[in-house]
C-alpha cells in the first residue's frame, strides 16, 4: 500500500471522532484501515477521501471526565465550494501494487463499496472476514450525487479496473439506496427502489435490464433477510401493510421472484424482529409492543409455528409498581391521517 497517506487524505480512515487529547495520545499508533477482500484473498479494495480543503467544524464535550475536550473534524456546510473527494483503490496483494479507479460520474459524489452480507452462522465467530460483494473477478459499489438525486449501482471488473453502471436511479427528489442482493453470483440482482413512490424490490438481469417488480402496493419494504436462489424466493421485512396495525410495526414476508405468492410469516399486532438461518428454513421471531411482555417463537419458512422459545419474566419489574404505557391513535388535522402515539402515566 502507498505510504503517502496524510491526515484528512488517508486510506481507510481519517481519524475522525478523536478529541484533542486522543489525537495526541494516538499520534504514533497504527490505525486499522477498513478494507474489503476478494473471496480468494488475492485482491482488496479500500476507499480514500481527500478532505484537506474542507473547513473545520468543532464539538465540545463538556461532560467528559476532567476538563472539557474538543473534537475537530471536516464538514462541508451548505453553499461552500470545497467538498470531500472520495476515491476507490484496488490492490493486488501478491504483486503489492494498487491503482486508483476512475469512478468519476457526479461532481462531489460520495462512494460506497458494498460488502458481502454476513452469515448468521458466523455471528459468534471471533474472526469474520470482510469480503466485497461479488466474486473473484468483480465487485459492486454505489455512487451518489451531492444533491442525493442520482444514484448508480456499479460493477467493477477486477482485471481491467473498468466500472460499469448496472442500475441507475434519477429523481427530482431525495433518493435512498440499499445494497443490492445478488442472485447466482450476479446473474440477477434484487434492487430496492422508491421509483413507484413506495420502497419496493425489483429484479434486474446482470446487465441492468429490469425483469419485473417483485413487490408492490401501499406499504414500505425495508430489508432483504434472505434469498433462496434455488426456490427463487425472497425473504424481506416490511411495514405498513397490515390493516389496523401501527404502520411502524415490522413483519417478515416471503415472495417469489416473479412477484407471486406474497405471504406474511409472523402475523400478530406486534413489532417483530426476525432472524433467519442461512439455509432459509427457520426463523426466530421476537415480538412485543410497549404494553406487552416480549416473546420469541420458532417458525418455519412458511410461517408455521414450530415451538415457543422464551417469554420474558417481568415479575420483578411489576413488583416495583411499573405499569405499561398506553398506545393510542388519533386523527390528524386533516381528519384522515392516523397518528400513533404512546401515553406514559405516573405509576400512582
Identify what each model region corresponds to.
Residues 2-36, 43-114, 302-317:
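Predominantly five- to eight-bladed beta-propeller fold
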Residues 14-39, 115-132, 178-187, 191:
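Signature of short aromatic-glycine-proline-rich micro-motifs recurring in repeat-based ectodomains
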Residues 23-24, 99, 117-120, 164-168, ...:
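A short beta-strand motif characteristic of beta-propeller blades
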Residues 25, 76-82, 120, 142-146, ...:
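Short consensus segments that form the blades of beta-propeller domains
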Residues 45-48, 54-55, 81-87, 101, ...:
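Non-catalytic accessory segments flanking enzyme active sites
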Residues 93-96, 158-161, 205-209, 256-260, ...:
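Short loop/turn segments that connect beta-strands within beta-propeller blades
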Amino acid at each position: 500500500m502507498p505510504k503517502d497517506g496524510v491526515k484528512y487524505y488517508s486510506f481507510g480512515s481519517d481519524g475522525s471522532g478523536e478529541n484533542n487529547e486522543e489525537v495526541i495520545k494516538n499520534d504514533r499508533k497504527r490505525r486499522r484501515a477498513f478494507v474489503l477482500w476478494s473471496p480468494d484473498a488475492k485482491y482488496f479494495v479500500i476507499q480514500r477521501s481527500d478532505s484537506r480543503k474542507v473547513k473545520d467544524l468543532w464539538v465540545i464535550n463538556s461532560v467528559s471526565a476532567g476538563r472539557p475536550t474538543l473534537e475537530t473534524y471536516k464538514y462541508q456546510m451548505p453553499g461552500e465550494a470545497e467538498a470531500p473527494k472520495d476515491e476507490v483503490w484496488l490492490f493486488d496483494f501478491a504483486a503489492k501494487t494498487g491503482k486508483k479507479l476512475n469512478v468519476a460520474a457526479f461532481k462531489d459524489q460520495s462512494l460506497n463499496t458494498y460488502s458481502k452480507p454476513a452469515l448468521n452462522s458466523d455471528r459468534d465467530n471471533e474472526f469474520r472476514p470482510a469480503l466485497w460483494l461479488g466474486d473473484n473477478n468483480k465487485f459492486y459499489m454505489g455512487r451518489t450525487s451531492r444533491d442525493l438525486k442520482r444514484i448508480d449501482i456499479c460493477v467493477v471488473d477486477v482485471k481491467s479496473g473498468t466500472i460499469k453502471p448496472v442500475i441507475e436511479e434519477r429523481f427530482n427528489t431525495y433518493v435512498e439506496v440499499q445494497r443490492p442482493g445478488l442472485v447466482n453470483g450476479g446473474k440477477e440482482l434484487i434492487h430496492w427502489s422508491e421509483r413507484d413512490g413506495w420502497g419496493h424490490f425489483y429484479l434486474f438481469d446482470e446487465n441492468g435490464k429490469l425483469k419485473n417488480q417483485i413487490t408492490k402496493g401501499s406499504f414500505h419494504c425495508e430489508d432483504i433477510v434472505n434469498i433462496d436462489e434455488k426456490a427463487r424466493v425472497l425473504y424481506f421485512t416490511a411495514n405498513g401493510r397490515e390493516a389496523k396495525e401501527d404502520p411502524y410495526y415490522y413483519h417478515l414476508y416471503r415472495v417469489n421472484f416473479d412477484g407471486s405468492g406474497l405471504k406474511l410469516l409472523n402475523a400478530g399486532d406486534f413489532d417483530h424482529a426476525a432472524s433467519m438461518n442461512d439455509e432459509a428454513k427457520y426463523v426466530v421471531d421476537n415480538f412485543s409492543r410497549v404494553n406487552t411482555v416480549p416473546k420469541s417463537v420458532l417458525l418455519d419458512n412458511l410461517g408455521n409455528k414450530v415451538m415457543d422459545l422464551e417469554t420474558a419474566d417481568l415479575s420483578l419489574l411489576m413488583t416495583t409498581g411499573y405499569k405499561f404505557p398506553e398506545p393510542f391513535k388519533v386523527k390528524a388535522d386533516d381528519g384522515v391521517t392516523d397518528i400513533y402515539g404512546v401515553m406514559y402515566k405516573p405509576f400512582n
